[in-house]
Amino acid sequence: MSFYDEIELEDFTFDAGTNLYTFPCPCGDRFEISLEDLQLGEDVARCPSCSLIVRVIYDEDEFMEVDNDASTAPIIIAA
């Protein structure tokens, strides 16, 4: 896979309404990567208008999803 560039996530803009991080693309549109993609360990942002892609540099540990599954929670029994 050939990347146009490598860009730090902190240089992207986050839109809380769409949960997308975006960064300007040379074609005039914007590279996009979703919060969900980052939580899944993805590091590729794509431009929807052209074929360019960039590698997103970020700390994956900051985006790890916390498992709030009740089935793994401890059960407290009151006597």
Curated annotation (Swiss-Prot):
PROSITE patterns: DPH_MB. SUPFAM superfamilies: CSL zinc finger (SSF144217). The keyword Membrane does not apply. Residues 3-59 form the DPH-type MB domain. GO terms for cellular component: cytosol; nucleus. Its cofactor is Fe(2+). Transmembrane segments: none annotated. InterPro entries: DPH3/4-like (IPR044248), DPH_MB_dom (IPR007872), DPH_MB_sf (IPR036671). Gene3D superfamilies: DPH Zinc finger (3.10.660.10). It catalyses: [3Fe-4S](1+)-[protein] + Fe(2+)-[Dph3] = [3Fe-4S](0)-[protein] + Fe(3+)-[Dph3]; 2 [3Fe-4S](0)-[protein] + 2 Fe(2+)-[Dph3] + NADH = 2 [4Fe-4S](1+)-[protein] + 2 [Dph3] + NAD(+) + H(+). Disruption phenotype: Sensitive to sordarin (fungicide), methyl methanesulfonate (MMS, causes DNA breaks), hydroxyurea (HU, ribonucleotide reductase inhibitor), thiabendazole (TBZ), sirolimus (TORC1 inhibitor), thermal stress, and cold. Simultaneous disruption of atf1 exacerbates sensitivity to HU and MMS. Global protein levels are unaffected. It is found in: Cytoplasm; Nucleus. Pfam families: Zn_ribbon_CSL. Fe cation binds at C25, C27, C47, C50. The keyword Repeat does not apply. Belongs to the DPH3 family. Required for the first step of diphthamide biosynthesis, a post-translational modification of histidine which occurs in elongation factor 2. Dph1 and dph2 transfer a 3-amino-3-carboxypropyl (ACP) group from S-adenosyl-L-methionine (SAM) to a histidine residue, the reaction is assisted by a reduction system comprising dph3 and a NADH-dependent reductase, predominantly cbr1. Acts as an electron donor to reduce the Fe-S cluster in dph1-dph2 keeping the [4Fe-4S] clusters in the active and reduced state. Component of the 2-(3-amino-3-carboxypropyl)histidine synthase complex composed of dph1, dph2, dph3 and a NADH-dependent reductase, predominantly cbr1. The DPH-type metal-binding (MB) domain can also bind zinc. However, iron is the physiological binding partner as zinc binding impairs the protein electron donor function. This is Diphthamide biosynthesis protein 3. It comes from Schizosaccharomyces pombe (strain 972 / ATCC 24843).
